[in-house]
């Protein structure tokens, strides 16, 4: 909404899945659409929400080369960078090379990690002086970029040693939740697929096969879940026409209860 409210049009470059079901960037599509629509402002998501990809250095380098060739300023949403699973590693987009450092506005926050979205504690990292001046000028007019005293102290606490301990323990909990959910989907939910996320606490399940076999709509599946207390989100908001977005940031006992209800009442 912020983009549209600013009078801009959104052009999407959809991710694609390879033969192993891993979500990938479509660099050719990205380059084509940037040229076709004369785009010079790109919003990039790393780690990706909702598919959970943690982009590796080669992938990030290829993406930044496309943006460099087309003279694009990049806003890199790295709000999920604390929630990294297994042995994956988040690589800040600005660390790829000097050009990436110059043309990128990186956005961070502790809201996802510590559940502090209501405190308005997000911040940006900008190295280019011209871009920095432009952002400062716009934010000073709206005051939207201003933090309050409480959010400042929350940020300090989050980035303390105690905060790091919390983050590490949180990732362990989420990893166990993901293990359970993926195993449950693969073994007990016929017609539902999901690629294991590498980061975030979101699942992006694909119900295409189930919808075709059951002759149901995604809306009907979503409603049947809500009717039995399963809170989930329509994946069409994320260009997944047969997908549902599920939040796994909760105790494992609740994850088990939710998936048991899916099998008993929804995917039947």
Question: Can you say where each PLM-predicted feature lies in the sequence?
Answer:
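PLP-dependent class I/II
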Residues: 1-268
């Amino acid at each position: 909404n912020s983009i549209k409210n600013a009078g801009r049009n959104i052009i999407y470059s959809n991710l694609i899945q390879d033969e192993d079901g891993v979500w990938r960037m479509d660099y050719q599509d990205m380059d084509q659409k940037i040229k076709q629509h004369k785009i010079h402002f790109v919003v990039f998501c790393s780690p990706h929400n909702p598919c959970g990809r943690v982009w590796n250095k080669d992938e990030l380098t290829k993406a930044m080369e496309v943006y460099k060739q087309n003279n694009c300023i990049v806003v890199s949403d790295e709000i999920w960078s604390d929630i990294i699973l297994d042995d994956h590693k988040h690589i800040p987009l600005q660390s790829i090379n000097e050009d990436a450092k110059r043309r990128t506005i990186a956005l961070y926050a502790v809201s996802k990690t510590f559940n502090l979205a209501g405190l308005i504690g997000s911040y940006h990292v900008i190295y280019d002086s011209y871009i920095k001046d432009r952002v400062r000028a716009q934010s000073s007019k709206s005051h939207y970029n201003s933090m309050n005293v409480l959010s400042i102290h929350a940020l300090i606490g989050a980035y303390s040693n105690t905060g790091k301990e919390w983050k590490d323990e949180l990732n362990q909990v989420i990893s166990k939740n993901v293990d359970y959910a993926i195993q449950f989907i693969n073994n007990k939910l016929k017609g539902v697929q999901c690629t294991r996320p590498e980061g975030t606490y979101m699942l992006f399940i694909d119900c295409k096969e189930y919808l075709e076999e059951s002759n149901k709509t995604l809306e009907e599946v979503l409603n049947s879940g809500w009717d039995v207390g399963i809170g989930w989100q329509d994946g069409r908001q994320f260009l997944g026409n047969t997908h549902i977005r599920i939040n796994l940031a909760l105790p494992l006992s609740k994850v088990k209860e939710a998936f048991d209800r899916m099998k008993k009442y929804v995917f039947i």
